[in-house]
């Protein structure tokens, strides 16, 4: 039976071992919790709930309850004295003791993290499940099972508190997204992202709030008392796309970069709109009447929240970059500054009710180029993997606690309100994407196709941010908050399970372009930067200031001022690819000397000596070792930063101040003549003849010979070579009629007086061009193809250097082709 079950599911005992281990650990922990009377309170400020009041005495390492309870057989009483006459008996020292309250908090946190990690391992070792169901769905199911198990044994399941989510679980995910944000794709599509994030979120919030208010008016007695302000607050919570859910789903389907950055960028930037609307409607709930000034201040607060969060992030990013200048002697603490300054930016933004997500993104984007230029490669690797690990664990815990909190929370169900909420969310998303895309495509060069619009609309997933904001609602001002929370959980489960599970087959069905898995080559990087500089120059010439122009201005300012302040030492200057090459060569030479292989290399490098070192039998192996990923990444960084400075070495110009150099034309003509002479000498040395070439005449095409042979009139001051076309019997035969020129070209001059080249030859070869003319027949009856009697065809057979004579004529064709001049 076990073999049949394993064969059906494709599982083996090693694969199910992590899951069984987690189940055994949970089942074993529950009796311990029950025996010690640990009842986590759902109203606690932490995940596990509030602890009983405890007091700590001065100088003590451990804590003790304020009111200790004494038991008759308590083993912790080590100073128990039993007097029996004059003799005092003392109880033995306890070898083993249990104090769970002392380690309760870190133990439970570690257990939940261990559960999250083991669940991720278990999902990925079972490909039949992970290929069909997204990881986020499986984690929510695990949370539901764990919550039901805890509730089944009589315990209170832990609840995902909003403070824990916003202060501890959300920042690692946003920092990872902001620090490794693909900046090029993000900036190129920033306008589209802002329209979807701002206008789209506002449309969803007010459209959903207005329709739900109309439903509440006619929905029955249970929801008749829900006002317009309540539905608008609920609409602002449920309308925002969640970045955690988007990251979890879109990274598994490997969608192309454009769609990924549009949906993910929208989920990041709509936080400012969500925060403003939430606090705005929450404040309006305390007012008796709302005036025009209140609405205007609420509109102004949007810019304050968004731009204030960006400003806080930029300030902390600059401070982090400046601090990294002085960490060259203490490399161990370099990664710590990145985490601390980013987290301080988030907390500072939340302190003033600004957008903490915008602050984290801004700090990560600003600090990354300068910090990576200052820190070591090992520190960069540490930052990369720690952020990935931290964000992955936080994301896993969030989805698990969504399932646990669903079991632990109090719910209120109303079919009309919940189904209307789900239906209106889908309608608002589809209408918003269609209308906004129609407007955006009027200004985009790369249009968004109907397939792209469908993926954008279908990828609007909701997640833990909406759940946490719904949990923060005050029951005093919003008495139907339990109904709102139930509707939020329903929408989250529908988007994560239904849309998240079906988006992968839909992407395959629609043949949507996938993400390029391999990195771009260095050649592609060079050509991309080349096109950027080309477009910048075109914008300058045309007088049109697009984003390439402002990007170039920002790069110039960055190089002139910012880099000198934030990057230490010589690294603040322009990095050179040649310097990196010398560094790499020096490292290889040192390794070669240390390995003792220097004596095998001869002092004089030649082709023969290199062949002796590397025999022909090893020709298939590469002489030079392949570049490692680290070196290739460093070359990419050098090229990115170095190619941005190419235009700065040129003098400034525009279309109105073009000054011609008087010596430039003469210099170019001289260089051109030298180049022509060099090419002519090379052809003479290779083919022992002169290519018949006339620049002023049109190119001879492969036309068939008619009654009259084709001829071109040469210049009077140029020598003439008359050429007989090749006969069908000897297609390689060429008749050079001018014998003196032939001897001059071949270096076989029969006249001793013409051995030296005189002024007449220099005049003839002034331009380094030899003119060509076809031989005219002496009489109408003379055959054009008959060679002169004084020259035999075999003596005139030379290598074909003039042109390709073309294919042999077909059997039915008696007319050969005219050779085309090179």
Curated annotation (Swiss-Prot):
Gene3D superfamilies: 6.10.140.1330, 6.10.250.1040, 6.10.250.2020
Region: Interaction with PPP3CA, residue numbers: 688-691, 719-724
Region (PI(4,5)P2-binding region): 513-520, 556-564
Topology Cytoplasmic: residue spans: 126-134, 181-190, 254-256, 327-332, 376-377, 443-448, 510-822
UniProt-annotated stretches for the region Interaction with CHP2: 519-549
GO molecular function: calcium-dependent protein binding; calmodulin binding; potassium:proton antiporter activity; sodium:proton antiporter activity
Protein keywords: Antiport, Calmodulin-binding, Cell membrane, Glycoprotein, Ion transport, Lipoprotein, Membrane, Palmitate, Phosphoprotein, Sodium, Sodium transport, Transmembrane, Transmembrane helix, Transport, Ubl conjugation
Chain positions found as Phosphoserine: 603, 606, 609, 652, 697, 701, 707, 727, 730, 733, 792, 794, 803
Pfam hit, one: NEXCaM_BD
Interaction with CALM1: annotated segments: 637-822
Compositionally biased tracts (Acidic residues): 759-768
Protein function: Electroneutral Na(+) /H(+) antiporter that extrudes Na(+) in exchange for external protons driven by the inward sodium ion chemical gradient, protecting cells from acidification that occurs from metabolism. Exchanges intracellular H(+) ions for extracellular Na(+) in 1:1 stoichiometry. Plays a key role in maintening intracellular pH neutral and cell volume, and thus is important for cell growth, proliferation, migration and survival. In addition, can transport lithium Li(+) and also functions as a Na(+)/Li(+) antiporter.
Protein name as it appears in the record: Sodium/hydrogen exchanger 1
Species per Swiss-Prot/TrEMBL record: Cricetulus griseus (Chinese hamster)
């Amino acid at each position: 039976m076990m073999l049949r079950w394993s064969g059906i599911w494709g599982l083996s005992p090693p694969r199910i071992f992590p899951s069984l281990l987690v189940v055994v650990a949970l089942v074993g922990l529950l009796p311990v919790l029950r025996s010690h009377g640990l009842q986590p309170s759902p109203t606690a400020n932490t995940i596990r709930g509030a602890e009983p009041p405890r007091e700590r005495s001065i100088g003590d390492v451990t804590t003790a309850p304020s009111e200790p309870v004494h038991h008759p057989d308590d083993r912790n009483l080590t100073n128990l004295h039993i007097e029996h006459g004059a003799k005092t008996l003392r109880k033995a020292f306890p070898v083993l003791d249990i104090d769970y309250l002392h380690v309760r908090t870190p133990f439970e946190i570690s257990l939940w993290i261990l559960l999250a990690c083991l669940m991720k391992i278990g999902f990925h070792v079972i490909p039949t499940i992970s290929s069909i169901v997204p990881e986020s769905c499986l984690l929510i199911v695990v949370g539901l099972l764990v919550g039901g198990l805890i509730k089944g044994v009589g315990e209170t399941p832990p609840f995902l508190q909003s403070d824990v989510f916003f202060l501890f679980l959300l920042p690692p995910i946003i920092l990872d997204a902001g620090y490794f944000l693909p900046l090029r794709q993000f900036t190129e599509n920033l306008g589209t992202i802002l329209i979807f994030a701002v206008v789209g979120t506002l449309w969803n919030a007010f459209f959903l709030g207005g329709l739900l208010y109309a439903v509440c008016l006619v929905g029955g007695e249970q929801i008749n008392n829900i006002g317009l302000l309540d539905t608008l607050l609920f609409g602002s919570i449920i309308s925002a796309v969640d970045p955690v859910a988007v990251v979890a789903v879109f990274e598994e389907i490997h969608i192309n970069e454009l769609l990924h950055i549009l949906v993910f960028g929208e989920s990041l930037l709509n936080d400012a709109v969500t925060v403003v609307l939430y606090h705005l409607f929450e404040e309006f709930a305390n007012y008796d009447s709302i005036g025009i000034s209140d609405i205007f201040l609420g509109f102004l607060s949007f810019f304050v929240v968004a731009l204030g969060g960006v400003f806080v992030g930029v300030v902390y990013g600059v401070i982090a970059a400046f601090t990294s200048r002085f960490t060259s002697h203490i490399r161990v603490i370099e990664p710590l500054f990145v985490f601390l300054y980013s987290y301080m930016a988030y907390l500072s933004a939340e302190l003033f009710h600004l957008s903490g997500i915008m602050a984290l993104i801004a700090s990560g984007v600003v600090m990354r180029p300068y910090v990576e230029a200052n820190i070591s490669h090992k520190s960069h690797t540490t930052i990369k993997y720690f952020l990935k690990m931290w964000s992955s664990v936080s994301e896993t815990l969030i989805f698990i606690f969504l399932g646990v909190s669903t079991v632990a929370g109090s719910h209120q169900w109303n079919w009309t309100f919940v189904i209307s909420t789900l239906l209106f969310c889908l309608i608002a998303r589809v209408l918003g994407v269609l209308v906004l895309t129609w407007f955006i495509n009027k200004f985009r060069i790369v249009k968004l196709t109907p397939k792209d619009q469908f993926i954008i609309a279908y990828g609007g997933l909701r997640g833990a941010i909406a759940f946490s904001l719904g949990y923060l609602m005050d029951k005093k001002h919003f008495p139907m908050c339990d109904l709102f929370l139930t509707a939020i959980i329903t929408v989250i489960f529908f988007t994560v399970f239904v849309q998240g599970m079906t988006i992968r087959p839909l992407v395959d069905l629609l043949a949507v372009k996938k993400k390029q898995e391999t990195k771009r080559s260095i050649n592609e990087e060079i050509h991309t930067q080349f096109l950027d500089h080309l477009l910048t120059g075109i914008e300058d010439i045309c007088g049109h200031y697009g984003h390439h122009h402002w990007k170039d201005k920002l790069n110039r300012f960055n190089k002139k001022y910012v880099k000198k302040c934030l990057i230490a030492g010589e690294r603040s200057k322009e990095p050179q690819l040649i310097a990196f090459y010398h560094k790499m060569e020096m490292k290889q030479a040192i390794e070669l000397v240390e390995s003792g292989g220097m004596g095998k290399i001869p002092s004089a490098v030649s082709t023969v000596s290199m062949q002796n070192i590397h025999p022909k039998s090893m020709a298939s192996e590469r002489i030079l070792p392949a570049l490692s990923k680290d070196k290739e990444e460093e070359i990419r960084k050098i090229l990115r930063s170095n190619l941005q400075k190419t235009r700065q070495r040129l003098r400034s110009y525009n279309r109105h101040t073009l000054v011609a150099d008087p010596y430039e034309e003469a210099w170019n003509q001289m260089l051109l003549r030298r180049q022509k002479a060099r090419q002519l000498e090379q052809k003479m040395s290779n083919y022992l003849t002169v290519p018949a070439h006339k620049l002023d005449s049109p190119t001879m095409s492969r036309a068939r010979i008619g009654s009259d042979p084709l001829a071109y009139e040469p210049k009077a001051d140029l020598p003439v070579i008359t050429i007989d076309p090749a006969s069908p019997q000897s297609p390689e035969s060429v008749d050079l009629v001018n014998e003196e020129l032939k001897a001059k070209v071949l270096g076989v001059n029969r006249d001793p007086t013409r051995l030296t080249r005189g002024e007449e030859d220099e005049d003839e070869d002034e331009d380094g061009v030899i003119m060509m003319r076809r031989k005219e027949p002496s009489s109408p009856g003379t055959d054009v193809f008959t060679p002169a009697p004084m020259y035999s065809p075999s003596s005139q057979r030379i290598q074909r250097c003039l042109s390709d004579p073309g294919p042999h004529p077909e059997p039915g064709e008696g007319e050969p082709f005219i050779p085309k001049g090179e």
